[in-house]
Amino acid sequence: MPTLAVHGGAGRLDRRARRAEIDAALERALGAGFDAAGGGALDAAVAAVQVLEDDPLFNAGTGAVLTATGGVELDAGVMVAAGLRTGAVAGVTDFANPVELARAVMEDGRHVL
């Protein structure tokens, strides 16, 4: 049986008041992952992370914590066990879904980061 887990983050913010909203967003991420799972585990993981990156409730993408200068710097990474393939990006400032860039780095194969 396929299994997919998403992690909505950790931190000091009191999320109890928004629990239903957060749970619904996590369900959307899981749904997107399972919808994309026909393409494989990587497709499922990337689709799920994109939902989290697009939701301001999470410290990723749209909801990322701002830097000291008020900007956004995003990091992302992907890994595929078969072939020990990996790709990552760091400090991305002008791209909505850095997980897509991390995947592109991995698929290009010339670099890891």
Task: Give each language-model segment a name.
Residues 1-113:
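Alpha/propeptide regions of enzymes that mature by internal proteolysis
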